[in-house]
């Protein structure tokens, strides 16, 4: 196959472009282009390749997915980031060599994307849209000075601890939403419109979220769930898996009329007064080689 490699060398503990290219070519493929940064992402489609390979963390994969949305060219993932939620959701595991070797017998799986429209315009997303704990934790993490060349495990644990610190002082705020025409309102600590089960530092908010079923999983956690969220974070910090235990709603369309600081994947947006956000599922907008 002719491969375009979209690679973020700053992600996690990943290999160099040279090493990745050598591995891909060793398995009989031709690397026809290498794209390095998010600013260059639109160049992904310039080369006439059979496959776009996103090598990096969830941010790198999300950027590639937005460029490929609605296009025929499939994407493969080489998970080299910190959380690797998207690869984990598609059960893409193993060494780089093992993952590349599997492409020869792999299948193209349809993958849903979401589209969020609001004061910022329209934006595709692959992981989630939400507010409360996750958005405030992303904002808090962004305020910290970057530390390079740290082991993935340390980065994950620090991110979980940051979520715990944010939760300790977080107040539930009013949200007003409509899920497939059904009105829902309340004061929530966390709201998440999920395309995949995992979010942030491998937090499994809804194990049944499926990026191939044409629906979102929607989680709304209020003050009654504070202790459950805290336990979930404690177990993640200890690298143990335990479910959040909060009801997951199903919806194809979500309208938010009142809310809090909002995140779309890993981008955070302030909530303007009287703003409305519309979130739609776009089934099979992407194809992933697994």
Which stretches of residues belong to each language-model region?
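ATP/NTP phosphate-donor binding region
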Residues: 1-55, 62, 97-101
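Catalytic core of DAGKc-family lipid kinases
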Residues: 4-5, 18, 27, 32-36, ...
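Short N-terminal binding/cap micro-motifs at the start of the first secondary-structure element
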Residues: 12-16, 200-201, 286
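Glycine-rich beta-strand-to-loop/alpha-helix junction loops that act as flexible
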Residues: 55-57, 78-80
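Short Gly/Thr/Asp-enriched flexible loops that form oxyanion-binding sites at enzyme active sites
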Residues: 60-71
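Glycine-rich phosphate/pyrophosphate-binding beta-alpha loops
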Residues: 130, 134, 192-205, 268
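Gly/Ser/Thr-rich active-site loops/lids in small-molecule metabolic enzymes
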Residues: 145-157, 198-227
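ATP/nucleoside-binding phosphotransfer catalytic cores, i.e., glycine-rich phosphate-binding loops
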Residues: 179-180, 185, 210-290
């Amino acid at each position: 196959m002719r491969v375009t490699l979209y690679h973020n060398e700053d992600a996690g503990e990943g290999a160099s472009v040279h090493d990745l290219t050598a591995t891909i070519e060793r398995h009989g493929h031709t690397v026809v282009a290498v794209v390095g940064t998010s600013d260059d992402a639109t160049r992904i489609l310039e080369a006439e390749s059979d496959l776009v390979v996103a090598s990096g963390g969830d941010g790198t994969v999300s950027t590639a997915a937005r460029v490929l949305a609605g296009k025929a060219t499939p994407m493969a993932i080489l998970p080299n980031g910190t959380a690797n939620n998207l690869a984990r959701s598609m059960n893409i595991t193993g060494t780089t060599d093992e993952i590349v070797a599997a492409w020869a017998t792999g299948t193209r799986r349809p993958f849903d994307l979401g589209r969020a429209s609001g004061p910022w315009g329209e934006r595709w997303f692959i992981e989630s849209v939400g507010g409360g704990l996750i958005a405030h934790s992303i904002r808090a993490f962004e305020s910290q000075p970057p530390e390079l060349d740290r082991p993935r495990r340390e980065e994950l644990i620090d991110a979980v601890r940051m979520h715990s610190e944010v939760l300790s002082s977080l107040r539930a705020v009013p949200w007003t939403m409509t899920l497939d025409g059904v009105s829902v309102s309340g004061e929530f600590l966390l709201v998440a419109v999920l395309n995949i089960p995992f979010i942030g530092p491998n937090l499994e908010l809804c194990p049944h979220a499926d990026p191939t079923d044409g629906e979102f999983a929607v989680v709304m956690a209020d003050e009654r769930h504070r202790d459950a969220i805290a336990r979930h974070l404690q177990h993640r910090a200890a690298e143990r898996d335990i479910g959040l235990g909060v009801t997951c709603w199903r919806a194809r369309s979500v309208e938010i009329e009142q809310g809090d600081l909002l995140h779309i994947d890993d981008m955070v947006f302030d909530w303007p007064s009287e703003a409305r956000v519309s979130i739609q599922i776009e089934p099979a907008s992407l194809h992933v080689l697994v």
